[in-house]
Amino acid sequence: MFSYQRGQFDLVIHNGLVVVGSDVMPPSTYIGIKGGVIEQISATPLTGKKIIDAEGGYIMPGGIDSHVHLSQKNTPAGDTFESGTRSAPPGGTTTVIPFAIQNSKEDFDLVSAVEEYHTVAKNSSYCDYGFHVIISNPNDEILKTQLPLLAQQHGITSVKVYTTYPRYRLSDEQVLDILLSNRKLGITTMIHAENADIIDFIGKKLEEKKLTDPFYHSESRPKVAEDEATYRVISLSKMIDVPILIVHMSSETALATVRDAQNNLVPIFAETCPQYLFLTADYLKHQCSHHVHKDDPFEGAKYICSPPLRQSQAELDGVWKAIQNGTVTVFSSDHAPTIYDHPLGKKAGLVNGIPHYKKVPNGLPGIETRMPLLFCKGVETGRITAQRYVELCCSNPAKLYGLDKKGTIAVGKDADFVIWYPKGKMAPFVLSNSMLHHGIDYSPFEGVEFTNWPRYTILRGCVVWDRDNGGLMASKSTGQYVKRTGSSMPGPMGKLSYIFE
């Protein structure tokens, strides 16, 4: 509830459960905001030009979606920077980190790719943003000259590498080169861990049998491909004594391997995504009760992503366990969608009317639904605490990726917030794609019932989402680029061999 009056602060928020670190501060807490920054947190009333009464709902830091793909050249039917970030404030997200990509294995100029991406993003973002970079050819020019330049001048302190996909796949030796370089620079390494040879081997066998419907995407990328690659990249990380983040983890076995490393104080971090908590491979099948258009035999293509949706609820429960016990460090969307009904989108997988999963662009939409899904199905059901939720969606991404002004509610931090309805205050609803703000013609979570949704989203002290009074208040020029520092999560253990010094 909004009110206006005279006061010393630009905005005051009060009467909510304020989630700060491991604590939940009582509704008697007042937060005073001035110049886009949190200036005071008080147990006594504060006055402001604008007042938000949270009416007993949770007040949390603005969400950080640290794994999104926007305006990528290889996905012409995907979300642009403008359409993708438009969906961030309505879902409680105030900062996203998409990827600038090395254009090809022959391209030695990563700096130009970043500068080009800056041009794409400028005045096209509804929320704040930073950049990761994807490296597909770790030559000396990039590792010794360009990465230091990007870290120092652009504040880019994270690199993603792949063990799969022909365009991006690196050898173990190349991964080691990057890990050693990133250790020296204090850069976070993100790794997509799947065994490419296993995937290629099974894919050939499926093609020989003409098994190419969307469902066979999940068969072609079995859990063992993720399990083996996870063990391998952890071994490489230990050899160089450098932390890594393994992205979009879906396998309980792979997550147990991460847990074992963590229990031995090895700094291995894990990310998972909504699809690995809520969707199974049944959605990929020719006929599925969850499909919106049950008469469309190709609808399963909407759910193609990698790693793929897993086979059973038990496997999803294993990922939930890793969320609950602290194995998972960050919860991201891996928003990488393409329009379904488009010849360059998901329908690219229909060749002369014959489905072929290998030709379907990978990826699902998810920026807007990420935080509401975990809040409704995690916090409100008691599967996780509000504090754990904030760790996963806000504070840990900020720490891991060097967003020093984001991710927590504290004096001096950016005034980024998401405010939820008090439990039971909002009428439940069933999601349809028409309710969302992205540029994609479907959501994998259509048909899911939501019991809560962000009531307000606030970015640097400005209300950018007011669900009850005006909806989206941000514009495409609202977002600002955020230069990042190094990770503040646990780092190297000091065990680097003299060979690599």
Q: Can you annotate each of these PLM segments?
A:
Residues 212-241, 290, 296-303, 330-331, ...:
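His/Asp/Glu-enriched, well-ordered alpha-helical/loop segment
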Residues 110-127, 177-191:
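Alpha-helix-loop-beta-strand connector modules within alpha/beta enzyme cores
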Residues 1-47:
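N-terminal metal-binding scaffold of metallo-dependent hydrolase/deaminase domains
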Residues 54-124:
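Metal-associated gating/positioning segment near the N- to mid-region
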Residues 144-331, 347, 352:
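Histidine/acidic residue-rich metal-binding segments in metalloenzymes
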Residues 16, 31, 36, 56, ...:
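Divalent metal-coordination and catalytic microenvironments
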Residues 16, 344-362, 411-482:
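C-terminal cap of metal-dependent C-N hydrolases
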Residues 69-79, 94-111, 130-145, 161-173, ...:
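Divalent metal-binding segments
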